[in-house]
């Protein structure tokens, strides 16, 4: 974000720096004595303020901890309790971060907002604004931005999207911030910096561990394989950390919160041919034609799978041309036309290949 601000400043924009405070470290991980890390630590605030002072533009801290906690963190907890796997970064970008930035931009009479995300904003000849992948495919973040509405995209500038990460690091060095160029990237959830989301849930939900401990692991025939530590502490596709020895690799294929049950199977049991997606936000077009082809990504690092899209109720039915593995309800499905984002939504449920369905219900 600092490099994005300096790039725009160099191009002649009148820049106002904003650093967002989204969460309280101590409230999330407790007083562990560990150094505060992640996007909201004191060092990141100081780095941003130093750059602003040195280049002569104002800098403010925007405290959105209350809004972030009320929506993003609560949604994170509720989704796991519902047996789904949330994506808090998508929720934050869609519902909190951009809206808060735009509100402050309006108060400061700013025309645009800008962030350090690796993606591009373009306008189609139909007048609609849409996202395009950043040219550095290894750093592209368009997947996490699918929820941005037209009024936000029309006033968003993403200057890093047409550069590779190594070029941005070189720019940071050229701007006089060699330490910024050397900074390691943070991949953990900002409010779970120790990457222990299970511990986070236990701290936030009183009595959760006692309430869900001792449910059954079962296979796809319903046979009980053992007991688990509680369904919210597992995700579809998980293999490691199951704490059960079956003498063969086992994967979480389904989570049933109503009965505190976790279904285990072989890797092939993760294959899915269809999924239902709701909460759709269209970007490039204002909708789809029935059977429209798209490359659908089901997770951030996913390369995407060719699919056809069909409307159903108030959502989209995605039919994959080949089986896809590890589709997790609660995650985002993002539809691409080449490098362009058509739209996206939240995965509700999946359909297994017919052969597996037949086996399950005979």
Regions found by a protein language model. Give the residues of each.
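AMP-forming adenylation/ATP pyrophosphatase catalytic core
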Residues: 34, 114-121, 125-362
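ATP-dependent adenylation/nucleotidyltransferase module used to activate substrates
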Residues: 1-146, 166-167, 357-361
């Amino acid at each position: 974000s600092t490099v994005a601000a300096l790039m725009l400043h160099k191009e002649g924009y009148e820049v106002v720096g904003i650093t967002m405070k989204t969460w309280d470290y101590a409230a999330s991980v407790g007083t562990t004595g560990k150094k505060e890390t992640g996007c909201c630590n004191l060092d990141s605030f100081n780095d941003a303020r130093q750059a602003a002072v040195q280049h002569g533009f104002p800098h403010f801290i925007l405290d959105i901890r209350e809004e972030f906690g009320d929506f993003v963190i609560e949604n994170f907890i509720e989704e796991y309790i519902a047996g789904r796997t949330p994506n808090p970064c998508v929720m934050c970008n869609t519902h909190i971060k951009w809206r808060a930035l735009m509100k402050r931009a309006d108060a400061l009479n700013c025309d645009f907002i800008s962030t350090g995300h690796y993606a591009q904003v373009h306008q189609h000849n139909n007048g609609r604004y849409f996202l395009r992948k950043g040219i550095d495919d290894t750093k592209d973040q368009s997947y996490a931005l699918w929820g941005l509405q037209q009024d936000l995209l029309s006033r968003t500038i993403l200057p890093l999207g047409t550069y590779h990460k190594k070029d941005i690091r070189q720019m940071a060095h050229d701007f006089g911030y060699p330490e910024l160029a050397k900074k390691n990237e943070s991949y953990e959830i900002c409010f779970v910096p120790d990457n222990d989301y299970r511990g986070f849930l236990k701290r936030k939900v009183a009595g959760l561990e006692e309430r869900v401990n001792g449910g059954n692991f079962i296979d796809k025939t319903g046979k009980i394989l053992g007991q688990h530590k509680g369904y919210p502490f597992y995700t579809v596709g998980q293999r490691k950390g199951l704490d059960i020895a079956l003498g063969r690799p086992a994967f979480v294929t389904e989570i049933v919160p109503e009965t505190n049950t976790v279904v285990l199977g072989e890797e092939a049991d993760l294959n899915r041919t269809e999924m239902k997606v709701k909460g759709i936000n269209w970007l490039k077009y204002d909708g789809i034609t029935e059977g429209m082809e798209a490359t659908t990504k089901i997770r951030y690092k996913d390369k995407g799978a060719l699919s056809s899209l069909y409307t159903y109720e108030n959502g989209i039915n995605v039919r994959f041309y080949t089986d896809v593995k590890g589709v997790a309800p609660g995650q985002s499905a993002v539809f691409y036309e080449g490098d362009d984002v058509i739209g996206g939504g939240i995965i509700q449920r999946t359909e297994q290949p017919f052969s597996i369905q037949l086996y399950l219900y005979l």
